[in-house]
Amino acid sequence: WIMGHMVNKKYQVDEFANLGANAIEFDVTFDPNSKADYTYHKVPCDCGRTCGKYEVFTEFLSYVRNKTTPGHPSFREKLILLQLDLKMSGFSDSESNEAGKDVAKKLLNYYWNRGSNGGRAYILLSIPSIDNQLFLKGFKLQLETEGYSEYLEKVGVDFSANEDLNSILNVLGRLEEEHVWQSDGITDCLARRSTRLRDAIKKRDTGDDRYGIKKVYTWTVDYYPSIRYYLRLGIDGVMTNFPNRVEYILNEEEFSGSLRMATIDDNPWEKYVG
């Protein structure tokens, strides 16, 4: 999975897809009432990127719906996963819960179009902390209440704050969440040890819990040697500002026989057995 980082403007969807991304990550901010409002990343952000670009969240969802709906003139066949980086730092339990309900409603109305020719991409909810776990409860409850629980098959979760992995897995078990991605990373401006990432990969490969880790990705990785290093560790995804670099490396002799880009036929909620 080649995950284009900080794709917060409409024009950037095509820009990153043209560079080879089959997934895009965009930020989601909330107003004081826990309502999702913009695709916005404040200063600071990654080195070499311009912070502060944004769209209205619902308008962006409608735009990417068209990009991921077969038959639409602007359909991008290879774009198969949307990651929502949910900006909920400091939210209380009730605020997290309300935010989950609101995001579910907006996905239902503006992306899935309530079942009428909606987008087909998988959705990855990137929740900042296990302290925000009630977001997921609110999200699921809203879809179930409105009679659209079938969309939960398209949705997975990632806790992104580099917290203790065992604590995360305990929360996932309590939430009975099976569609689990686990991230580890830091801004491209800084270096980070791979100890926790290696542990996540080990838990993915050795765990047999239905609520365990299915995919592991790292962020944000932009340099050729670093991309190769992480691929050798056995990650499933790379979040990057330069998708073309990851695509180039996947075609190198070392990787071309064992790795390929994911397609819509690859289930992101299952472990990959190469």
From Swiss-Prot:
Disulfide bonds: 45-51, 47-189
EC number, UniProt record: 4.6.1.-
Tissues of expression: Expressed by the venom gland.
Catalysis performed (reactions): an N-(acyl)-sphingosylphosphocholine = an N-(acyl)-sphingosyl-1,3-cyclic phosphate + choline; an N-(acyl)-sphingosylphosphoethanolamine = an N-(acyl)-sphingosyl-1,3-cyclic phosphate + ethanolamine; a 1-acyl-sn-glycero-3-phosphocholine = a 1-acyl-sn-glycero-2,3-cyclic phosphate + choline; a 1-acyl-sn-glycero-3-phosphoethanolamine = a 1-acyl-sn-glycero-2,3-cyclic phosphate + ethanolamine
Cofactor note: Binds 1 Mg(2+) ion per subunit.
Cofactors, names only: Mg(2+)
InterPro entries on file: PLC-like_Pdiesterase_TIM-brl
Keywords: Cytolysis, Dermonecrotic toxin, Disulfide bond, Glycoprotein, Hemolysis, Lipid degradation, Lipid metabolism, Lyase, Magnesium, Metal-binding, Secreted, Toxin
Other remarks in the entry: The name 'Dermonecrotic toxin LspiSicTox-betaIII1' has been assigned by Binford et al., 2009 to AC C0JB92 and AC C0JB94, both derived from Loxosceles spinulosa specimens collected in Namibia (Grootfontein) and South Africa (Borakalalo), respectively. To distinguish between these proteins in UniProtKB, the letters G (for Grootfontein) and B (for Borakalalo) have been appended to their names.
Function in brief: Dermonecrotic toxins cleave the phosphodiester linkage between the phosphate and headgroup of certain phospholipids (sphingolipid and lysolipid substrates), forming an alcohol (often choline) and a cyclic phosphate. This toxin acts on sphingomyelin (SM). It may also act on ceramide phosphoethanolamine (CPE), lysophosphatidylcholine (LPC) and lysophosphatidylethanolamine (LPE), but not on lysophosphatidylserine (LPS), and lysophosphatidylglycerol (LPG). It acts by transphosphatidylation, releasing exclusively cyclic phosphate products as second products.
The protein's name: Dermonecrotic toxin LspiSicTox-betaIII1 G
Organism, scientific name: Loxosceles spinulosa
